[in-house]
Amino acid sequence: MSQFVLEIGTEELPARFLPALERELAERFTRALADAGIECDPVRVMSTPRRAVVRMDAVNPVQSESEEVVTGPPARIAFTPEGGLTKAAEGFARTQGVEVADIFRLTTDKGEYIAVRKHMGGARSIDLLRDICPAIIGALPFPKRMRWGSGDFTYARPMRWLLALFDESVVDFEVGGVRSGNITYGHRIHGAGPLTVARAGDYERVIREQGGVTPVGEERRNAVVKGGNALAVAAGGKVIWKDSLLDEVQGLVEHPVPCLGNIDPSFLELPREVLLTSMESHQKSFGVEDAEGRLMPHFLTVLNLTPLDGDLVRKGWERVLRARLEDARFFWKTDLASSFDAWLASLDNVIFLGPLGSMGDKTRRLEQLCAWLAAEVGFDDATAAARAGRLSKGDLVSGMVGEFDTLQGIMGGIYARRMGEAEAVAAAIAEQYLPAGPDSPVPSSMCGALLSIADKADTLAGCFGLGMIPTGAADPYALRRCVLGIARIILEHGLQLDVRGLFAKAFALYGERAWKLAPEDALVKLDEFFMARLRNLFIANGYETLLVEAVLAAGCDDVRSAGARLEALAAFSRRDDFASAVLTFKRAANIIRKQGGDSDVALDGAWKADLLVEDAERQLAASLEAMFPRFDGLWAEGDYPALFGLLGELRPVVDGFFEGVMVMSDDAALRTNRLNLLQALVGRLSRLADFGALQM
């Protein structure tokens, strides 16, 4: 077996491009090699800011061979009466690229035809790779592309060299004016090159030993963590590792060297969040804390070289960070000299969204919506909820958030505490933007949960009223995240809340607006949007799609109820008699669905005892009369597992009804009475789930 390596050398790529680039290269090469019939071990991909590398340590040097029988025209038109070949047969041979002598007769179920055997494959893998490599490189997707020089070729950053080796042979091709060869370049300081690679198998040794490059991202990450931990422990602390920043940092360096710097202890008067954000956002550095979780006057950064004078480099980093922290301290002191009243007045000059007014208008709506929500869910501190809504956006015009926009909400909570607001109000302001993503926690406080719901509902109502409905991947106002956030908060806090009523109230608080969609139409679309996202959330949480759809079809205005019903139905589905129960109740639901629309008499679920002539229908009526009070009591308690247990008890009686009674009797009175029996049953069933939507 042979070895292959491809290195795409560029100017520094953004760190965020590297994970997707590695995935694309692995998937595209794996697919292209399989399509070409080139057998190889799994494709390995690694990357640094200046290179993307594809390696295969065991590649078949020759394409797989196969034989294919190609059928031509029927023998009766391929041969003359004398046995010679007709023009049709000669044309077939010419089309297939074979000699006429290769034609033979083939008997099939449809008769006798002519055919040829074609031998496929057998090409040299290196020859096939000459076409595969440039095709893949040119098709790689990037968030942004650029041109350089005078050519039209585009890539994420200017391409400077291409190394492509199959064993010791160069895979010769050209992309964007750059021709492949056996030359690579190492770290700009520790092994710039050019470096010659004699064989594909030598590449990694050369780039590591001569080039001073650590080509594998996971190795760079581990080196940062190991070295950083050692430095922090020596200083009596531990590094505050942040995974997203760690991933970014390893993608910024080829030769990672952790470096521990110091900050003036006086800066520790700043809030922890401000210090960490200053370090992380501007300097790509990590904070250091002691065993009690208190910040220490140190930071950890990662260099892209081993410096000749480590102290000099460290002092340079300290000087730059000090300037950042001086700015942060200025904003902190300036903001503390201001007040929420001043900020709220300024919010009237900050636009929320076009026709939707100012951020000041939004805070006044949130004040009312939070108070309404508190009453709806039975929260006993409506005053705190309303106050949190009113102050929620004040920090947007503060100096600190103007400098560090990721601290919005967080700084509002900190300032609220410093300015004497109640703890519930401060906590709610700090938590208002949670959850920030699918894996982010929801607000921990009830006041924060209500403010977060109100904020998201207000945004959703306004955007849908303006026709700003997400389509495809486009969602500039993160409305999908808003919906998922509302659903998660309701589920995780166990709130009994009518979301349709929530959205209607949010629309009403806007008053008269120049809506693009009438509020009633926008509400319908918002309900559909919410149900679709709730469906996705339940499925992502591991529930079967059919069960989710059956529960949501029974109603999802009360998200807590929908979640509890789904959990109970999932448990019921694991019972041995589940399939039988579904078939029974599905039959009842389907009959009512069909006959309810066709019947001349409206079905209201009220049957007449004097029209119960069969034992089976009398037994069903008696069972329903006994069950309904139990059902209604359990429904009021929200005991859905017990409700599904009731259905299990009832199933044999319903089966007996279907076996012993002709529902669609010729007697109209009997038919209507029997349909009403089923309507009474289905009316209760449909509160739990739409059994007609289940498939067995």
From Swiss-Prot:
It catalyses: tRNA(Gly) + glycine + ATP = glycyl-tRNA(Gly) + AMP + diphosphate. Its main location: cytoplasm. It comes from the Bacteria. GO terms for cellular component: cytosol. The keyword ATP-binding applies. The keyword Nucleotide-binding applies. Keywords: Aminoacyl-tRNA synthetase, ATP-binding, Cytoplasm, Ligase, Nucleotide-binding, Protein biosynthesis. It holds the Pfam family tRNA_synt_2f. GO terms for biological process: arginyl-tRNA aminoacylation; glycyl-tRNA aminoacylation. It is found in: Cytoplasm. SUPFAM superfamilies: HD-domain/PDEase-like (SSF109604). One of its GO terms (molecular function) is glycine-tRNA ligase activity. Its EC number is 6.1.1.14. It is an enzyme of class 6 (ligase). Tetramer of two alpha and two beta subunits. PANTHER family: GLYCINE--TRNA LIGASE, CHLOROPLASTIC_MITOCHONDRIAL 2, GLYCYL-TRNA SYNTHETASE. Belongs to the class-II aminoacyl-tRNA synthetase family. This is Glycine--tRNA ligase beta subunit. It comes from Nitratidesulfovibrio vulgaris (strain ATCC 29579 / DSM 644 / CCUG 34227 / NCIMB 8303 / VKM B-1760 / Hildenborough). The lineage of its organism: Bacteria, Pseudomonadati, Thermodesulfobacteriota, Desulfovibrionia, Desulfovibrionales. The gene is glyS.
